[in-house]
Amino acid sequence: KGALAEARHVYIDSALRASGKKEINVLEIGFGTGLNTFLTFLESQEKGLRINYTTFELYPLSPDITEKLNYPALIAPSSESIFALLHQCEWNQKIAISPLFTLYKRHADSLEGIYDVVYFDAFAPEKQPEMWDEKIFREIFSHLSPGGILSTYCAKGEIRRRLQSVGFTVEGFPGPPN
């Protein structure tokens, strides 16, 4: 449940809800387990938000791994089929998951479009240093709408300075409530 609480806090509460918009273009760097996508889908249905969700993943998890993930059982057992669908959707095609939620899983590393919210969910800088490069942040910043939000777990000073150097205003937040 720790990963679930952190994902809700960092991405849903601190970014998606903080955007204050009813129609939101979301970019996720790192689809991974699909947890952030699933939480965003559920939020869109509950709050009536129209979400255009683009996610990048160069190394998708295999079906034998994703089928074992139990997030729906912990969050919304009636949504198990939606969670499975998020993983089974074709890559590089926009798919309407519901009238309010469109998913575009990209198996690429170049950005297109303008985003209101960015979930930067790459592995830690020590594990995946190439993802935390100033060049990547500059590219993301150039695709962010005015007043757009980038949210990440990383609180390292070095990463904060890189974000600021390309134009981001950086704010720190306390961790998730216990």
Residue ranges and their predicted role:
Residues I65-G113:
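S-adenosyl-L-methionine
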Residues T54-P60:
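Conserved acidic E/D residue at the C-terminus of a beta-strand in Rossmann-like folds
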Residues V117-Y119, P146-C154:
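Conserved beta-strand signature within the Rossmann-like core of class I S-adenosyl-L-methionine
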Residues K1-I29, T33-Q45, Q128:
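Class I S-adenosylmethionine
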Residues K156-N178:
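Class I S-adenosyl-L-methionine
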Residues D116-M131:
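A short SAM/SAH-binding and catalytic strip from SAM-dependent methyltransferases
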Residues E130-G147:
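A short glycine-rich, Lys/Arg-flanked "PGG" loop and its adjoining helix->strand segment in the class I
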Residues L42-N52, A73-L74:
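Conserved S-adenosyl-L-methionine
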